[in-house]
């Protein structure tokens, strides 16, 4: 029986520390396991790409060997943003592809995001890969698979610039946080006719300037400063593999993705009245009424890019988004999460206004916290911790308790959320309310619940 670290098999990707839990041997075995799943589905060709992390080339070589030793033909698209790998998978490989990326994890992490036959591997499908490895259930290869190399970037950029139409050229600033998006974002937005100020767009897997995670306000401070000190109208930021988008106004306001989705939903619903719009459990309580007001049907889903994608497939929703910054367009695009493309769609909408910051700042808003994190003790199961807390929790004045993903407690004047992260050993909390007094009241109720476990430290 092959041995592999079990804890790298997460809810919607595989992710671990390079050389410790995610070894070269693990990459090879994962390649063989994916090939076995592919063989079951009659898939013979898989697109393979990597982000800008230093461990990428070596992991790529080993997973590639796992594929070709199993008779799978590989389309190697090299260093790309995750959405570009998805683009190659959909257009060249029947929806099958593997992206080597650590997303926004620290530099010593890396991992794999996987699609087979148009379906994102998640949950049980990822556990099946582990089972194949542990039972040596690999497919018997006939002949060795081939490797074809292709630069997909030109086709990808052309596909976007071919259908996005700005009403006027804009002046924008972008911050790629030294992630792989920096290699392509400037070219894309200049190709749409904009003036672009580029921050940290050279790809550097050590992330020397700030972490490439636009969901954290501290990582947007350089972009905010560039907007205040320069002549750019709007700022766009990307995570390490550019499948997530951050947005900042001229006056330094961060427009979180749930508010971005208001604008995207309104735009899509103009052309698709009555359509469904999907959002995750972390999103503002102002989003569902906004979607309904603009003629759409609002659907709340559990957090995670693969869960959102499968919900889009099931419901036929043309647009979806989640609080971490993944925005998904099926209308005029392919349905996968794409920070670069979402940025282009945002500019298309904002270019109709002479004051884009005003358009963004006018979106409904209440008082809210960013994501708050509580570190879990080594070896503890976040979902189990949440279940234990929920079992003894009481929330006075709650109007609804939603349990699709952790515990989201609705009150007449706000909500509180606690859920287990699927990618890191933390609990994620978020609060929102109509007034500061209400948000503090809701937080205090959650604080009492959290502190009933002596191993958890309240983050505020």
Swiss-Prot record:
Its main location: cytoplasm. The keyword Translocase does not apply. It is found in: Cytoplasm. Its EC number is 5.4.2.2. One of its GO terms (molecular function) is magnesium ion binding. InterPro entries: A-D-PHexomutase_a/b/a-I, A-D-PHexomutase_a/b/a-I/II/III, A-D-PHexomutase_a/b/a-II, A-D-PHexomutase_a/b/a-III, A-D-PHexomutase_C, A-D-PHexomutase_C_sf, A-D-PHexomutase_CS, Alpha-D-phosphohexomutase_SF. It comes from the Bacteria. Keywords: Carbohydrate metabolism, Cytoplasm, Glucose metabolism, Isomerase, Magnesium, Metal-binding, Phosphoprotein. The active site is at residue 103. Binds 1 Mg(2+) ion per subunit. The keyword Transmembrane does not apply. One of its GO terms (biological process) is glucose metabolic process. Belongs to the phosphohexose mutase family. This is Phosphoglucomutase. It comes from Neisseria meningitidis serogroup B (strain ATCC BAA-335 / MC58).
């Amino acid at each position: 029986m092959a041995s592999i670290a079990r804890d790298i098999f997460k809810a919607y990707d595989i992710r671990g520390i390079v050389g410790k839990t995610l070894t070269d041997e693990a990459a090879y075995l994962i390649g063989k396991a994916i090939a076995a799943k592919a063989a079951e589905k009659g898939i013979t060709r898989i697109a393979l790409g990597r982000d800008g992390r230093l461990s990428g080339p070596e992991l790529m070589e080993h997973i590639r060997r796992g594929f070709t030793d199993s008779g799978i033909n590989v389309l190697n698209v090299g260093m790309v943003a995750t959405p570009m790998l998805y683009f190659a998978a959909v257009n060249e490989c029947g929806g099958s592809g593997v992206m080597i990326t650590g997303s926004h994890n620290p530099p010593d992490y890396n991992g794999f995001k996987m699609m087979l036959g148009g379906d994102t591997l998640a949950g049980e499908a990822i556990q099946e890969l582990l089972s194949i490895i542990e039972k040596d259930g690999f497919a018997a290869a006939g002949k060795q698979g081939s490797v074809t190399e292709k630069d997909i970037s030109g086709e990808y950029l052309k596909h976007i610039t071919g259908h996005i139409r700005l009403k006027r050229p804009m002046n924008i600033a972008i911050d790629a946080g030294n992630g792989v998006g920096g290699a392509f974002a400037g070219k894309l937005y200049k190709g749409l006719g904009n003036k672009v100020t580029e921050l940290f767009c050279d790809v550097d897997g050590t992330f020397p300037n700030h972490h490439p995670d636009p969901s954290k306000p501290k990582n947007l401070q350089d972009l905010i400063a560039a907007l205040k000190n320069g002549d750019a109208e709007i700022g766009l930021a990307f995570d390490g593999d550019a499948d997530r988008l951050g947005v900042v106004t001229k006056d330094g306001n961060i427009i979180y993705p749930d508010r971005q989705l208001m604008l995207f939903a309104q735009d899509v619903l103009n052309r698709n009245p009555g359509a469904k719009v999907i959002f995750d459990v972390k999103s503002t309580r102002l989003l569902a009424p906004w979607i309904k007001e603009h003629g759409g049907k609002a659907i709340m889903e559990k957090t995670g890019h693969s869960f959102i994608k499968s919900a889009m497939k099931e419901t036929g929703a043309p647009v979806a988004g989640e609080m971490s910054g993944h925005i998904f367009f099926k209308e005029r695009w392919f349905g996968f999460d794409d920070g670069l493309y979402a940025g282009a769609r945002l500019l298309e909408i904002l270019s109709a206004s002479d004051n884009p910051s005003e358009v963004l700042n006018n979106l409904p808003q209440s008082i809210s916290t960013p994501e708050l994190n509580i570190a879990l003790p080594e070896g503890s199961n976040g979902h189990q911790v949440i279940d234990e807390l929920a079992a003894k929790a009481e929330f006075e004045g709650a109007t609804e308790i939603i349990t699709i993903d952790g515990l989201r407690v609705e009150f007449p004047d706000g909500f509180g959320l606690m859920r287990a992260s699927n990618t890191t050993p933390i609990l994620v909390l978020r609060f929102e309310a109509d007034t500061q007094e209400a948000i503090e009241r809701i937080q205090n109720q959650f604080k009492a619940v959290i502190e009933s476990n002596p191993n958890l430290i309240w983050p505020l």
